[in-house]
Amino acid sequence: MTTILKHLPVGQRIGIAFSGGLDTSAALLWMRQKGAVPYAYTANLGQPDEEDYDAIPRRAMEYGAENARLIDCRKQLVAEGIAAIQCGAFHNTTGGLTYFNTTPLGRAVSGTMLVAAMKEDGVNIWGDGSTYKGNDIERFYRYGLLTNAELQIYKPWLDTDFIDELGGRHEMSEFMIACGFDYKMSVEKAYSTDSNMLGATHEAKDLEYLNSSVKIVNPIMGVKFWDESVKIPAEEVTVRFEQGHPVALNGKTFSDDVEMMLEANRIGGRHGLGMSDQIENRIIEAKSRGIYEAPGMALLHIAYERLLTGIHNEDTIEQYHAHGRQLGRLLYQGRWFDSQALMLRDSLQRWVASQITGEVTLELRRGNDYSILNTVSENLTYKPERLTMEKGDSVFSPDDRIGQLTMRNLDITDTREKLFGYAKTGLLSSSAASGVPQVENLENKGQ
């Protein structure tokens, strides 16, 4: 069976991931007019820039959908977002600022839940608005086929007939108007935005040029913290975790994770927390650039890692970071539910997150400027009395430390012998000044 259909399958049911925007509206109407039977599926991911979700399926029916469904994906999205925080599943960082993989998390959820809904309706052909140069075309492909092994893919934006007729936004707008729909193009921004309740991605157009900075972006989840005219008073906030799960903000306990994430977004958003500028490597190995917002994810991540460093030992923390980066890359590639990702997730959630219980108090200021004011946990292995310089009872004595240092003589001797061995082979040069072979100064050799 052919997995990817290059031309419209006339007379067959096609499920389209319908956003209600110009692209998917024109595609749905065009498919109906050309003889296909389109079904519209809209994912409610809690997008901060979407005002009326209920209106989207109604518009789809007006444009010719055989049926239109709104699928509430918010609970699952937040669950996956919390799992990513527990695992540190983030691999793109610049100067200490993190991209929280919010778009890949959204695709993992919508890509599986929409196809599952289509399968319920007997729809086994799926289309969406992803382009052939991006990451989403592969993410949706993987998640779709994982959910429905019989799935076939039809994308209007890969169909030359569709492209020839409606290849641009102007043509699509004219097509909608000619068909009796007063569809005006939205005002063109200097960049494109994709969002869900975990975060927002701003990219393309002017942002493709590295001399266009974050200052051209109008945040949809936060504030322009770089604008000195924007008043942002400092704010204290407490975040509580129980066994790796965020349960309370500022003393308010949440039984609904969706409401908790919305409140975390509001708190972090007031300061522009979690906004970053990243150059990343797409799945196809080409580099792209994005400006990201994730105020709630950033707030939870900071508190989680503060507790992590106070509870776990060095080797566990090292494995958390190493495996988290590996898992973040798998998530980015659309492999969040692959076996290698599940193995890493299970290990990190079972042996790391389960011990993260406690409360962190922060002072948020502008952007990513914050201070940690207090850390409290019954599981802390940070115990100041162990290392206090004040006189009193100690868990070990000076003689104990002398013995420990003496034991180091073994590996120090081995290391010294290795260094002189490297010098004999020419990898290092002998140094009379230090007595230790060193890397030769290339400047002295005129190189």
Swiss-Prot record:
CDD domains to which the protein is assigned, alphabetical: ASS
Catalytic activity: L-citrulline + L-aspartate + ATP = 2-(N(omega)-L-arginino)succinate + AMP + diphosphate + H(+)
Keywords noted in UniProt: Amino-acid biosynthesis, Arginine biosynthesis, ATP-binding, Cytoplasm, Ligase, Nucleotide-binding
Pfam families: Arginosuc_syn_C, Arginosuc_synth
GO biological process per UniProt: argininosuccinate metabolic process; L-arginine biosynthetic process; urea cycle
Residues engaged in binding L-aspartate: T131, N135, D136
Positions contributing to ATP binding: A17, F18, S19, G20, G21, L22, D23, T24, S25, A43, G129, T131, D136, D194
Compartment list: Cytoplasm
Primary subcellular site in the record, as a coarse category: cytoplasm
Xref: Gene3D superfamilies: 1.10.287.400, Argininosuccinate synthetase, chain A, domain 2, HUPs
E.C. designation(s): 6.3.4.5
GO cellular component: cytoplasm
Transmembrane segments: none
Binding residues for L-citrulline: Y99, N135, R139, S192, T201, E203, E280
Entry GO MF terms: argininosuccinate synthase activity; ATP binding; protein homodimerization activity
Family as reported in the entry's similarity comment: Belongs to the argininosuccinate synthase family. Type 2 subfamily.
Subunit annotation: Homotetramer.
Annotated protein name in UniProt: Argininosuccinate synthase
